[in-house]
Amino acid sequence: YGFETSEGFISDVTDKILPQIEDWQNRPLDEVYPILYIDAIHYSVRDNGVIRKLAAYVILGINTEGKKEVLSITVGDNESSKYWLSVLNELKNRGVKDILIICADGLSGIKEAIAAAFPKTEYPRCIVHQVRNTLKYVPDKDRKAFASDLKTIYHASDEEKARLALDRVTEKWTAKYPNSMKRWYDNWDAITPIFKFSPDVGKVIYTTNAIESLNSTYR
Protein backbone atom coordinates (compact mmCIF):
# COMPACT_ATOMS: atom_id res chain seq x y z
CA TYR A 1 0.00 0.00 0.00
CA GLY A 2 2.99 2.32 -0.37
CA PHE A 3 4.05 2.66 3.26
CA GLU A 4 6.05 0.74 5.85
CA THR A 5 5.73 0.32 9.60
CA SER A 6 7.85 -1.17 12.36
CA GLU A 7 7.33 -4.47 14.14
CA GLY A 8 7.11 -2.55 17.41
CA PHE A 9 4.21 -0.45 16.15
CA ILE A 10 2.35 -3.55 15.00
CA SER A 11 2.93 -5.21 18.39
CA ASP A 12 1.61 -2.14 20.22
CA VAL A 13 -1.54 -2.04 18.11
CA THR A 14 -2.07 -5.78 18.50
CA ASP A 15 -1.68 -5.61 22.28
CA LYS A 16 -4.36 -2.91 22.45
CA ILE A 17 -6.97 -4.54 20.24
CA LEU A 18 -6.59 -8.19 21.31
CA PRO A 19 -8.57 -7.73 24.57
CA GLN A 20 -11.40 -6.10 22.58
CA ILE A 21 -11.38 -8.98 20.09
CA GLU A 22 -11.50 -11.53 22.91
CA ASP A 23 -14.42 -9.71 24.55
CA TRP A 24 -16.29 -9.68 21.23
CA GLN A 25 -15.54 -13.34 20.53
CA ASN A 26 -16.81 -14.36 23.98
CA ARG A 27 -19.87 -12.11 24.23
CA PRO A 28 -23.24 -13.73 25.08
CA LEU A 29 -25.44 -14.73 22.14
CA ASP A 30 -29.19 -15.18 21.65
CA GLU A 31 -30.76 -18.49 22.61
CA VAL A 32 -32.28 -19.12 19.16
CA TYR A 33 -31.08 -18.38 15.63
CA PRO A 34 -33.35 -19.34 12.71
CA ILE A 35 -30.44 -19.50 10.23
CA LEU A 36 -26.66 -19.66 10.45
CA TYR A 37 -24.32 -19.34 7.47
CA ILE A 38 -20.76 -20.63 7.72
CA ASP A 39 -18.15 -19.83 5.10
CA ALA A 40 -14.37 -19.65 4.81
CA ILE A 41 -12.06 -16.88 3.66
CA HIS A 42 -8.56 -18.04 2.71
CA TYR A 43 -5.52 -15.88 3.40
CA SER A 44 -1.79 -16.13 2.82
CA VAL A 45 -0.02 -15.65 6.17
CA ARG A 46 3.66 -15.29 6.99
CA ASP A 47 4.53 -17.63 9.87
CA ASN A 48 8.17 -17.68 11.03
CA GLY A 49 9.28 -16.52 7.61
CA VAL A 50 7.18 -19.09 5.75
CA ILE A 51 4.09 -18.17 3.70
CA ARG A 52 1.19 -20.57 4.25
CA LYS A 53 -2.54 -20.63 3.68
CA LEU A 54 -4.95 -20.25 6.57
CA ALA A 55 -8.73 -20.08 6.62
CA ALA A 56 -10.85 -17.68 8.64
CA TYR A 57 -14.25 -19.28 9.26
CA VAL A 58 -17.03 -16.72 9.53
CA ILE A 59 -20.34 -17.59 11.20
CA LEU A 60 -23.15 -15.21 10.26
CA GLY A 61 -26.46 -15.55 12.08
CA ILE A 62 -29.93 -14.32 11.20
CA ASN A 63 -31.63 -13.60 14.52
CA THR A 64 -35.32 -13.86 15.38
CA GLU A 65 -35.80 -10.21 14.34
CA GLY A 66 -34.41 -10.98 10.89
CA LYS A 67 -31.20 -9.02 11.47
CA LYS A 68 -27.72 -10.22 10.49
CA GLU A 69 -25.14 -10.75 13.20
CA VAL A 70 -21.57 -12.04 12.94
CA LEU A 71 -21.35 -14.57 15.76
CA SER A 72 -17.81 -15.77 15.41
CA ILE A 73 -14.63 -15.64 13.34
CA THR A 74 -12.14 -18.43 13.98
CA VAL A 75 -8.86 -19.17 12.25
CA GLY A 76 -7.79 -22.73 11.60
CA ASP A 77 -6.03 -25.00 9.14
CA ASN A 78 -7.40 -28.38 10.18
CA GLU A 79 -11.03 -28.95 9.24
CA SER A 80 -12.48 -32.00 10.96
CA SER A 81 -15.60 -33.04 12.83
CA LYS A 82 -13.66 -32.55 16.09
CA TYR A 83 -12.75 -28.99 15.11
CA TRP A 84 -16.30 -28.09 14.10
CA LEU A 85 -17.73 -29.70 17.22
CA SER A 86 -15.53 -27.42 19.33
CA VAL A 87 -16.71 -24.38 17.32
CA LEU A 88 -20.39 -25.30 17.72
CA ASN A 89 -19.99 -26.16 21.40
CA GLU A 90 -18.45 -22.73 21.91
CA LEU A 91 -21.67 -21.21 20.53
CA LYS A 92 -23.61 -23.29 23.06
CA ASN A 93 -21.32 -22.08 25.85
CA ARG A 94 -22.18 -18.52 24.82
CA GLY A 95 -25.90 -19.17 25.22
CA VAL A 96 -27.15 -20.64 21.94
CA LYS A 97 -29.70 -23.38 22.59
CA ASP A 98 -31.28 -23.93 19.19
CA ILE A 99 -30.47 -23.34 15.52
CA LEU A 100 -33.15 -24.16 12.97
CA ILE A 101 -30.96 -24.25 9.85
CA ILE A 102 -27.21 -24.21 9.25
CA CYS A 103 -26.07 -23.42 5.70
CA ALA A 104 -22.50 -24.43 4.93
CA ASP A 105 -20.86 -26.29 2.11
CA GLY A 106 -17.61 -28.08 1.41
CA LEU A 107 -16.47 -27.99 5.04
CA SER A 108 -15.05 -31.36 6.03
CA GLY A 109 -16.62 -32.89 9.14
CA ILE A 110 -19.26 -30.24 9.74
CA LYS A 111 -22.23 -32.51 9.03
CA GLU A 112 -21.19 -34.90 11.81
CA ALA A 113 -20.48 -32.02 14.19
CA ILE A 114 -23.93 -30.49 13.61
CA ALA A 115 -25.57 -33.85 14.27
CA ALA A 116 -23.71 -34.12 17.58
CA ALA A 117 -24.09 -30.53 18.84
CA PHE A 118 -27.51 -29.59 17.43
CA PRO A 119 -29.21 -32.86 16.40
CA LYS A 120 -32.52 -31.19 15.45
CA THR A 121 -30.91 -28.63 13.15
CA GLU A 122 -31.50 -28.92 9.41
CA TYR A 123 -28.36 -28.95 7.27
CA PRO A 124 -29.29 -28.48 3.58
CA ARG A 125 -26.76 -28.58 0.78
CA CYS A 126 -25.82 -25.12 -0.52
CA ILE A 127 -27.79 -24.73 -3.75
CA VAL A 128 -25.58 -21.92 -5.05
CA HIS A 129 -22.49 -24.13 -4.89
CA GLN A 130 -24.49 -26.98 -6.42
CA VAL A 131 -25.47 -24.79 -9.39
CA ARG A 132 -21.95 -23.41 -9.82
CA ASN A 133 -20.47 -26.90 -9.89
CA THR A 134 -23.03 -27.96 -12.50
CA LEU A 135 -22.35 -25.00 -14.78
CA LYS A 136 -18.59 -25.02 -14.35
CA TYR A 137 -17.94 -26.93 -17.57
CA VAL A 138 -20.94 -25.70 -19.56
CA PRO A 139 -19.98 -23.33 -22.42
CA ASP A 140 -21.32 -19.77 -22.42
CA LYS A 141 -23.70 -20.48 -25.29
CA ASP A 142 -25.71 -22.94 -23.13
CA ARG A 143 -25.08 -21.61 -19.63
CA LYS A 144 -28.01 -19.19 -19.41
CA ALA A 145 -30.56 -21.75 -20.63
CA PHE A 146 -29.10 -24.48 -18.41
CA ALA A 147 -29.15 -22.20 -15.35
CA SER A 148 -32.77 -21.28 -16.06
CA ASP A 149 -33.72 -24.97 -16.19
CA LEU A 150 -31.90 -25.65 -12.90
CA LYS A 151 -34.07 -23.00 -11.23
CA THR A 152 -37.14 -25.13 -11.92
CA ILE A 153 -35.67 -27.70 -9.52
CA TYR A 154 -34.91 -25.56 -6.48
CA HIS A 155 -37.82 -23.15 -7.07
CA ALA A 156 -40.29 -26.05 -6.93
CA SER A 157 -42.96 -25.81 -4.23
CA ASP A 158 -42.33 -29.30 -2.83
CA GLU A 159 -39.96 -32.24 -3.09
CA GLU A 160 -42.13 -34.25 -5.49
CA LYS A 161 -42.31 -31.42 -8.02
CA ALA A 162 -38.59 -30.79 -7.58
CA ARG A 163 -37.78 -34.42 -8.36
CA LEU A 164 -39.91 -34.30 -11.51
CA ALA A 165 -38.10 -31.12 -12.56
CA LEU A 166 -34.75 -32.80 -11.86
CA ASP A 167 -35.66 -35.69 -14.14
CA ARG A 168 -36.82 -33.31 -16.89
CA VAL A 169 -33.64 -31.23 -16.74
CA THR A 170 -31.50 -34.36 -16.78
CA GLU A 171 -33.35 -35.77 -19.77
CA LYS A 172 -32.93 -32.49 -21.65
CA TRP A 173 -29.21 -31.96 -21.05
CA THR A 174 -27.64 -35.34 -20.34
CA ALA A 175 -26.94 -36.18 -24.00
CA LYS A 176 -24.92 -32.99 -24.39
CA TYR A 177 -23.35 -32.95 -20.92
CA PRO A 178 -23.43 -36.57 -19.68
CA ASN A 179 -22.20 -36.07 -16.09
CA SER A 180 -23.59 -32.60 -15.44
CA MET A 181 -26.52 -33.72 -13.26
CA LYS A 182 -24.88 -36.62 -11.42
CA ARG A 183 -24.16 -34.57 -8.30
CA TRP A 184 -27.80 -33.59 -8.03
CA TYR A 185 -28.79 -37.23 -7.69
CA ASP A 186 -25.82 -38.03 -5.43
CA ASN A 187 -26.64 -35.10 -3.12
CA TRP A 188 -30.43 -35.27 -3.36
CA ASP A 189 -30.97 -36.27 0.29
CA ALA A 190 -28.90 -33.25 1.36
CA ILE A 191 -30.75 -30.91 -1.02
CA THR A 192 -34.33 -31.85 -0.12
CA PRO A 193 -34.49 -30.21 3.36
CA ILE A 194 -35.17 -26.85 1.66
CA PHE A 195 -38.55 -28.18 0.50
CA LYS A 196 -39.72 -28.52 4.10
CA PHE A 197 -40.10 -24.74 4.17
CA SER A 198 -42.11 -22.16 2.26
CA PRO A 199 -40.62 -20.86 -1.03
CA ASP A 200 -39.75 -17.54 0.65
CA VAL A 201 -37.82 -19.27 3.44
CA GLY A 202 -36.26 -21.64 0.92
CA LYS A 203 -34.93 -18.67 -1.03
CA VAL A 204 -33.26 -17.32 2.10
CA ILE A 205 -31.67 -20.72 2.69
CA TYR A 206 -30.23 -21.26 -0.77
CA THR A 207 -29.12 -17.67 -1.31
CA THR A 208 -25.60 -17.17 0.04
CA ASN A 209 -25.38 -13.48 -0.88
CA ALA A 210 -25.60 -12.51 2.80
CA ILE A 211 -22.33 -14.10 3.83
CA GLU A 212 -20.58 -13.77 0.47
CA SER A 213 -21.09 -10.00 0.43
CA LEU A 214 -19.85 -9.85 4.03
CA ASN A 215 -16.74 -11.87 3.25
CA SER A 216 -15.96 -9.69 0.23
CA THR A 217 -15.57 -6.72 2.60
CA TYR A 218 -13.02 -8.67 4.66
CA ARG A 219 -10.94 -9.31 1.56
Per-range role (PLM):
Residues 3-7, 12, 16-103, 108, ...:
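RNase H-like nuclease fold core
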Residues 11-14, 111, 147, 166, ...:
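Hydrophobic face of alpha-helices
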Residues 139-140, 198:
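Generic structural signal for alpha-helix starts
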Residues 156-219:
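Acidic/histidine-rich catalytic cores and adjacent linkers
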Residues 8, 101, 129, 179-182:
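Short, solvent-exposed positions on alpha-helices
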Residues 119-136:
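Inter-helix linker motif
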